[in-house]
Amino acid sequence: MAATVAFSGVLRRAGWRLLQLRCLPVPRCRPALAPRAFRASAMQLRSLDQQKDQPPPSSSQQQSEAQGAEEPNPEALRSPPRYTDQGGEEEEDYESEEQLQHRILTAALEFVPTHGWTAEAIAEGAQSLGLSSAAASMFGDDGSELILHFVTQCNARLTHVLEEEQKLVQLGQAEKKKTDKFLRDAVETRLRMLIPYIQHWPRAFSILMLPHNIPPSLNLLTSMVDDMWHYAGDQSTDFNWYTRRAVLAGIYNTTELVMMQDSSPDFEDTWRFLENRISDAMNMGHTAKQVKSTGEALVQGLMGAAVTLKNLTGLNQRR
């Protein structure tokens, strides 16, 4: 009888153990590690395996390691520069080729008054950054990249100025200018950026008129006059939108030509010419005949300017 009771107790305990095992929660399937986490886990496992294969450290090694742990190296604690990409993942910071070229061209502008829009100016700019002068070989020999970079920077500076003026008006800290005065000041502000380089600007202008530079230079010009009209408050959606920008582009280019030949103090003749052209544009009607004549005059003026500048700079001479 006692044996039967004992055997029954064993069965009950075994059944309870089985029931406990069946009631244990089933672990959920863990998602696959992301590539970055997977690489980190693999590195940790590899490190553990290497530690297992190595002999145990001696007491002197343990003491030196303990001292090193007490006095961490500041350089080791400094994390490398990182940035966040479009996917939200952090990567180590690096400088792309475009960023390097941007830095070199920006530094080269300081040497344009001395060397002009040349490879020598680019080489000097590279050396000022601690780079080899051979970095100038990243660019062409005609200075096109340097000139286009300068125009792009000037347009960005102008946009910033116009944005700041708009903010002051919105905050009530400045009065809103009339359209003619706003455009005149905007064009003058942009042209004054050429003054430090005015001696070499005729050649830059002629280089921008070369066939392979016309698309980017025209894009920069149209973008600039569009910003001017935008901050002037233009909200036209009809044909006047194109007319106003074409007229302003013509005014800018013709005033630029006058400026390159102006010897008056502080380019007074240039600003007087600009004011008269802006006034004429504001008084001009919007008939089809006037629009056509304005467009034809603009094209003829630009073509004449290209021929004139080629003659001045000697680009039309055979070498």
Swiss-Prot record:
Positions bound to a 1,2-diacylglycero-3-phosphoethanolamine: 245
Domain of life: Eukaryota
Transit peptide: 1-45
Modified residues (N6-acetyllysine): 176
GO cellular component terms, semicolon-separated: mitochondrial inner membrane
GO process terms (BP): ubiquinone biosynthetic process
Span(s) of short sequence motif SIFI-degron: 17-32
InterPro entries on file: COQ9_C, COQ9_HTH, Ubiq_biosynth_COQ9
NCBIfam families the UniProt entry points to: diverge_rpsU
Recorded family membership: Belongs to the COQ9 family.
Subunit structure: Homodimer. Heterodimer; two heterodimers of COQ7:COQ9 come together on the same side of the lipid pseudo-bilayer and form a curved tetramer with a hydrophobic surface suitable for membrane interaction. These two tetramers assemble into a soluble octamer with a pseudo-bilayer of lipids captured within. Interacts with COQ7; this interaction allows ubiquinone (CoQ) isoprene intermediates presentation to COQ7 and facilitates the COQ7-mediated hydroxylase step.
Notes concerning its domains: Structurally similar to the bacterial FadR protein (fatty acid metabolism regulator protein).
Protein name, as recorded: Ubiquinone biosynthesis protein COQ9, mitochondrial
Provenance organism: Bos taurus
Lineage: Eukaryota, Metazoa, Chordata, Craniata, Vertebrata
Gene designation per UniProt: COQ9
